[in-house]
Amino acid sequence: MAAALAPRRHHLLSAADTTLVKVFEDRAVGLQRAELVGAHTGSAHMGLGLAELAAGRIDNHVHSHEEGFYILDGEPVLYLDGRGVRLKPGACGVIPVGVPHAWRSPGSARWIDMRAPRPRDPDQPTDTFVLGPTPEAEPSELDIRDPRNRNLFLLTDSDMDIDRLKTGASVAAPTVSASMATAALAYSGITVKMLVDQRTDAQLSTMFMVDYQPGAVAHPHDHPFEEAYYMLAGEINVVADNERYTLRPGDTFWTATSCIHAFYETTGNHVRWLETSAPGPPNRHSYRFQRDWEYLQEQRGEDAQRQPTGARGRDTSSSDRATG
């Protein structure tokens, strides 16, 4: 019997191969979507898409999955639990499980949507339930300072500017009050800003923005969850399971649980991408860096060389008995 092929643990979809098609015509007008990550890429946990709504609407409905989003272009209106909010590029948020929502766009708008758990297959019971037509109420402007706002956020370029974040924020600044909950994380030439997580009431996934400075690197590692990356600016080299790719704006890359991957900025330019993960990361052991365990292996090898031959033999037999 021939050995079964191992499941592929990563997938690249180039911008050139990303195709928008009409979807959900029973409940939407003017909507097109490209399925970037899903069952067809090997994902068990997420459905990532690029949506475009041109002079159209999506009727009021609920999902039995969570849906995060990030606005790329345009000013669509999101009706979330009956309240309309006009969004703009950089706006993002989460639509919790079971919360009624609808969309309307007077012009053209594009956004990334992230669904977790992965939407059900066509031959399974539905995970989407239409409630009625799209509301027509006049929307309000997005105000992220309003403490009643639970699910929405707005990312600006200054939120990723580490030098600006070194100075104090004005009490009248039109942003969420600065704190550890809204902080940007900087390491190894990389800046990470959380957009959608438990702070915005996401329970099943996360979404965040990633900036790489010239020469930045993330050494080989893997995770106990899946990740997807949608390129926005610059070029980055990614190595996944020993295969190397160059990612450019509009490209989508996905890594499965246990896919060992690394990122290298090699052109001397700034890089930015939108990243998602599902399930949400655990409190500990989100990363498993290869270099840490290689270090342990090296140390163990040095210890073994320093031991008498007899002692090394006894350690080996004891280990063999313990592991069976």
What annotation goes with each model-predicted range?
Residues 94, 107-126, 254, 268-287:
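A short hydrophobic beta-strand segment most commonly corresponding to one strand
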Residues 32-34, 48-63, 189-193, 208-222:
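Conserved short histidine dyad/triad with adjacent acidic residue
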Residues 207-210, 236-238, 251, 258, ...:
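A structural feature that tracks compact, well-ordered secondary-structure segments
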Residues 56, 64-77, 81, 225-237, ...:
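Glycine- and acidic-residue-biased ligand/ion/polar-headgroup-sensing regions
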Residues 82-98, 242-258:
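Short acidic-glycine-tyrosine-enriched beta hairpin
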Residues 1-44, 126-204, 288-324:
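A short, N-terminal "cap"/entry segment at the start of jelly-roll beta-barrel domains
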Residues 64, 83, 99, 107-108, ...:
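A generic "binding-loop/recognition-motif" signal
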